[in-house]
């Protein structure tokens, strides 16, 4: 489990920052939002397991968002990090910890990503406005999920990336619509108990994002399906492939390691804020659907 695997890490304390020097973060890509979060991810080199860490000593004292540092991002990094930022918006908005404060940031960041990521991908070396809007979206999404946390898509992406050496943003891109379908079912088993959170309204939450990003439809179900299609179209526009298999992950190796990957994803710290409680069998099926490109609700 994570608790056993991270025993040595949990015994250590992060040094108190800011007494001798400020922790200043200057991002050079638009995706992780790390310049605005108290999170880090480390990999155990012996086991290959990725672990997310959370501590306010990891939160920078200052973030400098300067588009000049982002103009030379290659297309692959632009697309992967951009969809990573979109995943931050979607998971923060659906999170059981979401609030009015995080919702506004997630909504505006998501709309910027849909509008400006294709431009940043196509003409990123010269389109300063697109780079600026993506830089802002990344930081805004970072602030949103720093306070609302994420969900099981990131849990699964952490382990998929570690087991099969896929970039983190690509892993999120391959999984996000499968997780959205999983979360948006009627009457899902809720993850946590909070006074402001009686039961999940995840379909309605996704539809709110969809409407803010220009999606219309006769009812929530139609709007949700159109939103899924809009996300898939964005991914295609920025050169992201459709399935895990398309990225050259060997089928036998994937299946052989699937159970271990599933167990570690369930134990990941991001799982706890997901709006629907996932069984390990359901995580496993979402991995399989993402590998083979099966668009079915788990």
Each model region followed by its residue ranges:
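Single conserved hydrophobic/aromatic residue that forms the stacking wall/gate
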Residues: 1-10
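Glycine-rich phosphate/pyrophosphate-binding beta-alpha loops
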Residues: 31, 139-172, 267-272
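Predominant activation on well-ordered alpha-helical scaffold segments within soluble catalytic domains
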Residues: 62, 83-91, 107-118, 135-139, ...
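Flexible, glycine/charged-enriched surface loops at secondary-structure junctions
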Residues: 97-105, 121-133, 148-153, 191, ...
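Short, amphipathic C-terminal "tail helix"
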Residues: 253-298
């Amino acid at each position: 489990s994570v608790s056993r695997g991270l025993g040595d890490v949990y015994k250590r304390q992060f040094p108190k920052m800011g007494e001798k020097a400020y922790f200043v973060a200057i991002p050079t890509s638009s995706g992780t939002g790390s310049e605005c979060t108290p999170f880090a991810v480390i990999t155990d080199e012996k086991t290959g397991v990725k672990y997310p860490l959370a501590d306010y000593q990891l939160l920078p004292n200052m973030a400098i968002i300067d588009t000049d540092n982002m103009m030379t991002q290659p297309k692959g990094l632009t697309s992967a990090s951009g969809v990573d930022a979109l995943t931050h918006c979607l998971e923060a908005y659906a999170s059981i910890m979401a609030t009015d404060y995080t919702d506004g940031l997630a909504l505006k960041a998501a709309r910027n990503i849909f509008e400006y990521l294709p431009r940043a991908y196509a003409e990123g070396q010269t389109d300063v406005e697109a780079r600026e809007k993506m830089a802002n979206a990344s930081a805004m999404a970072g602030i949103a999920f720093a306070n609302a946390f994420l969900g099981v898509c990131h849990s699964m992406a952490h382990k998929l990336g570690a087991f099969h050496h896929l970039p983190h943003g690509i892993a999120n891109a391959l999984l996000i619509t499968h997780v959205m379908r999983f979360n948006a079912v009627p009457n899902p088993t809720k993850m946590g108990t909070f006074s402001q959170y009686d039961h999940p309204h995840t379909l309605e939450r996704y539809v709110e994002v969809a409407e803010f990003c220009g999606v219309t439809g006769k009812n929530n179900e139609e709007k949700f399906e159109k939103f899924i299609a809009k996300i898939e179209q964005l991914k295609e526009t920025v050169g992201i492939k459709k399935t895990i298999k398309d990225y050259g992950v060997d089928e036998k190796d994937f299946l052989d390691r699937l159970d271990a990957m599933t167990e570690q994803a369930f134990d990941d710290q991001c799982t706890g804020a997901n709006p629907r409680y996932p069984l390990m069998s359901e995580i496993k099926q979402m991995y399989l659907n993402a590998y083979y490109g099966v668009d079915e609700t788990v």
